[in-house]
Amino acid sequence: MTTAEEIKTRAREVMARELPEDYDPNVKDDEPLLSEGGVDSLGFIHVLTILEAEFGAHVPDEEWWDATSLDALAEVILRNQKQG
């Protein structure tokens, strides 16, 4: 079973790879990614789409913006993982 820590670690890796100019690797898990983390909204959607695929989740559109920090992102992915 996937843990929140695994999702946060992978999210950091994906952001560092996909958004090298924007992502701040020192952002804390509870800080907003769209301001302190340096990620813009298009970059955020790109990262979330990658994580959805990797963790077998389907995040409804109305929940995407709940994932404002790494902590919240992990929670949203875990809540929406497909069972089985």
Which ranges hold each PLM region?
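Catalytic nucleophile serine of serine hydrolases
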Residues: 41
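C-terminal structural segments of small proteins and small subunits
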Residues: 65, 71-79
